[in-house]
A protein has these predicted regions:
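Conserved oxyanion/phosphate-binding beta-strand-loop segments in alpha/beta enzyme cores
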Residues: 71-129
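Middle-to-C-terminal accessory/interaction subdomains
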Residues: 22-25, 32-35, 39-41, 52, ...
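A conserved alpha-helical element in kinase catalytic cores
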Residues: 131-151
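Extracytoplasmic
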Residues: 39-43, 68, 103-105, 122, ...
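Structural recognition of the beta-strand scaffold that forms the well-ordered cores
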Residues: 45, 84, 105-109, 124-129, ...
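Short conserved beta-strand and strand-loop elements enriched in small hydrophobics
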Residues: 68-75, 158-161
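Internal "kinase-insert"/substrate-recognition segments embedded within catalytic cores
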Residues: 105-115, 122, 129-130, 148-157, ...
Length: 443
């Protein structure tokens, strides 16, 4: 049965459902000077032996997605031989590739060909091209908010040179892999599921899927297009979770860290990251089952935060995105069963409201602090952005999209304009001003 602990203790002390201690980010993130230090723009060089590497990697992206080719990687004065490289992404690969632009996302596996090879203790490097972010700041700004409340991949900026030529400025995003799990949970061998459909944005005849946690029957094959089990096993455990969500909700807390899910939903909603389970598109999360038997929700891929490239999702009323309902009332019944069932429960809805209010107060109300952080990041990145001839947007848009929306083809949400309008919406919710409990005389 779900443990209904004292709400005030949950909100102020930091202990979650089932007695599990909530996440403390201050002890886990990268030390100054490391790969994810935001005070610097790192530089990486990749040299392929095969001069036709690009056509090989483009072909494998569509026909053999896990195929990698060797390259020599240089970073911070060190050279690494025979790293395994493939292209990654979905729309962020397809859109530049369709235009003949070489600035596509990279996935680099340090130990693919040489066992135990690492780059500053990392086995995998994931480079996002910030293709739909004029500011180069949305992924990192969002990650810095998520990490206050959830186990969250780190992100930093990196100059990438390929075959001796500057390809562009990339966002270096931490992989959700065994190293991440060890860092965040002090364990790494549980079931890990990437909740992302298999279809390719520009692929022909690719299967459709939707990781919405609906029950699709007892055959695991029904789930293959919607989920990607990264561990050696896990389909049975995933289906057990989905079955409980849909048919045994009262006992869901026995298998899911519900408090962590509610934190994820709260941050998604507060910063309008609509590429999420309770956003416009259902994806971009992992589920990891820890040794205590609970699945943990892990957010990832934040480039569409602050409305991102989804600003114009409602063609007839594009500004409606700022008032995107925080409780999922815009969805059809059973469209998002986990969200629907949690927020139909009075206790979990109260806990969700508390988390939403916390994110609003701690991370969005002080707009001067948010702006200062973005300005510092952009100042650090400025030269690398100027020299990036493969970027999609102009330097004027690099600056202006921080403060205001950009309408060109798609709508690209401005970071501060989104925060200001979202704050206005959130401040109008009665739940934002409910009195908080006071705790005293605790032994």
């Amino acid at each position: 049965m779900k443990n209904k602990l004292l709400f005030g203790i949950l909100f102020f002390i930091g202990f979650g459902l089932n007695g599990q201690e909530l996440y403390n980010p201050q002890t886990l993130y990268d030390a100054p000077g490391g790969v994810f230090d935001l005070n610097f723009v790192r530089e990486m060089d990749i040299v392929f032996e095969d001069p036709n590497y690009h056509s090989v990697l483009v072909n494998s992206f569509f026909n053999a997605p896990s195929y990698r080719i060797p390259a020599t990687l240089s970073y911070n004065g060190e050279s690494y031989d025979s790293v395994g490289v493939r292209y990654k992404g979905n729309s962020t690969f397809c859109l530049p590739n369709d235009e003949g632009n070489p600035k596509v996302p990279y996935n680099i596996e340090m130990n693919h060909f040489i066992q135990a090879q690492k780059l500053e203790n990392l086995k995998k490097i994931k480079l996002a091209n910030a293709w739909m972010d004029p500011t180069f700041a949305k992924e990192i700004t969002a990650a810095n908010i998520y990490r206050k409340y959830l186990p969250t991949p780190e992100a930093s900026l990196l100059r990438l040179n390929v075959q001796g030529n500057y390809l562009g400025l990339y966002v270096n995003t931490e992989a959700v892999d065994k190293q991440f799990l060890q860092k965040q949970f002090n364990e790494k061998d549980g079931v890990l599921v990437k909740c992302d459909p298999v279809q390719v944005f520009c692929g022909n005849n690719t299967a459709n899927g939707n990781p919405d946690l609906k029950w699709m029957g007892a055959d695991s094959a029904n789930y293959y297009n919607s989920y990607d089990v990264k561990s050696d096993h896990g389909w049975g455990e995933l289906m057990e979770l989905i079955e409980k969500i849909n048919f045994d909700f009262d006992n869901l807390g026995d298998i899911l860290n519900i408090d962590r899910v509610l934190w994820a939903f709260a941050v998604n909603s507060a910063i309008l990251n609509l590429d999420t389970y309770n956003g416009y598109y259902v994806h971009n999360y992992y589920l990891y089952r820890t040794e205590d038997g609970l699945f943990q929700m892990i957010p990832w891929d934040f480039d569409n935060s602050f409305a991102g490239a989804i600003l114009g999702w409602d063609f007839f009323d594009p500004m409606a995105v700022y008032n995107y309902d925080t409780y999922g009332n815009q969805y059809a019944p059973n469209e998002r069963p986990l969200l629907e069932k949690l927020l139909d429960d009075p206790y979990y809805k109260k806990l969700y409201n508390a988390h939403l209010r916390t994110v609003y107060i701690e991370s969005l109300m002080d707009t001067d602090a948010v702006r200062a952080s973005i300005n510092q990041l952009q100042a650090t990145a400025y030269t690398a952005v100027v020299q990036d001839e493969n970027k999609l947007f102009s330097m004027g848009q690099y600056s202006s999209n921080v403060e205001e929306n950009l309408w060109t083809g798609l709508g690209f949400g401005g970071i501060m304009s989104m925060i200001n309008r979202r704050n206005a919406y959130l401040s109008g919710l009665q739940t934002m001003f409910m009195p908080t409990p006071e705790i005293s005389n605790m032994n």
